[in-house]
């Protein structure tokens, strides 16, 4: 409810300043699907086959995520797109800050449909925080994402709520996961590798700058294609 739309909102605002265009009010709505048993096993859950976990809402996570149903999410975005097409926008950019598979699939599907069935071109921009030749583990609520939100709103990030740094963060205890978990290659001890307690404002500024550059390049390319 906070991190993902806040990051997308600021990226959209700054990209519009650089490339031109207007920014619609932020849609504070996201979706998620149930986790496959294999991912739950890779997180360290022993009873994965009998568990029902939606997104990052593991049983011990203290705050539930603000997940809407996937069909409601898609219908809501569809209606926003329909209204924007009526306003005769030639290029509509959806800046998505949430990496859930279902959310990205729905947005990509709608972008393809509207680009082919209406006069508008719709593209989906997702923040790529790595520079050319750089490999980063974005993860969920790990160092990268925490650094980003520290850069955007450091006053509302309280890392002191975590245990001391020498205490490992088990995937089963927190709504935190490295990319390697979703790739089927979890850490041997099933604990967080890219620790959010290592997050800094400076790193967040660097990641944000990379994401902004990538999105602006994507928008510029779409503009150029429309003019061709």
Which residues does each predicted region cover?
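Extended, histidine- and acidic-residue-enriched regions that form the cofactor-binding/catalytic faces
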Residues: 1-93, 97-228
């Amino acid at each position: 409810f906070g991190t993902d739309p806040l990051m997308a909102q600021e990226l959209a605002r700054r990209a519009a300043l650089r490339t031109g265009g207007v920014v619609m009010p932020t849609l504070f709505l996201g979706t998620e699907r149930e986790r496959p048993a294999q991912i739950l096993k890779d997180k360290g859950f022993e009873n994965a086959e009998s568990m029902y976990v939606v997104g990052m809402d593991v049983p011990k996570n203290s705050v539930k995520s603000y997940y809407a149903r996937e069909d409601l999410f898609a219908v809501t975005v569809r209606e926003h797109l329909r209204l924007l097409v009526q306003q005769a926008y030639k290029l509509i950019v959806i800046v998505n800050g949430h990496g859930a598979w279902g959310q990205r699939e729905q947005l990509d599907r709608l972008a393809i449909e509207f680009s082919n069935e209406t006069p508008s071109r719709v593209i989906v921009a997702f923040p790529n925080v790595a520079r050319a030749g750089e490999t980063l583990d974005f993860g969920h609520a790990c160092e990268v994402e925490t650094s980003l939100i520290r850069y955007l709103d450091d006053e509302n990030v309280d890392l002191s709520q975590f245990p001391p740094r020498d205490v490992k963060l088990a995937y089963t205890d927190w709504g935190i996961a490295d990319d390697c978990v979703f790739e089927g290659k979890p850490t041997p001890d099933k604990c967080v590798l890219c620790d959010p307690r290592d997050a800094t404002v400076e790193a967040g500024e660097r990641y944000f700058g990379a994401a902004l550059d990538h999105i602006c390049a994507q928008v510029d390319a779409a503009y150029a294609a429309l003019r061709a």
